[in-house]
Amino acid sequence: MWVREPTSEFLTVAEDSRRWRHLTLRPDDIVISTPQKSGTTWMQGVVGSLLRWSDDDLGGVFLGTAWPEFRADSVQDLIDRLAAIDGRRSLKTHSPADCIPVADEDVCYVLVYRHGPDAFASWINHRARFSLEALALLNERAARDGLDPWPTYEGDVASLFEEWQRDCNPVRHLATWWPLRDQAN
């Protein structure tokens, strides 16, 4: 299997695309790529239902999925969790295409986009619900990379819009995936 290695990095308070460099893609992996708040969990549920549907355990549809760039887990925990998944895996990413390994036709890529104002409204709700503990943990890990912390959201939509444009930029995301649109996978 041929893999094009990343040529850039995607670093936010919550995400670090460099973590992908420690992973080995399997030929039957499914990579679900969306900008933040653009249908990722929905598509994970669709893919998981197709791969692991069980009337006995609806929650099982999320068992074979992981979010490699999420800073909350150690890289070794991520590697171990992915290695333990039997069968096909789905990997969630918000990273642009140039920031993750992109394989040939053996790996399937599913891209999902959402209307920009809808995605931003969802980002407002998402950030408003961050617990202080979760925000502190993510900010601490991001500080190691010299990133500015996410402040507690207190209703300043204009500042949050700047954060969303920087960290969730759907235009950059699409611009990096668009040249790959004619690939078989």
Where do the model's predicted regions map?
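PAPS-dependent sulfotransferase catalytic domain
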Residues: 1-184
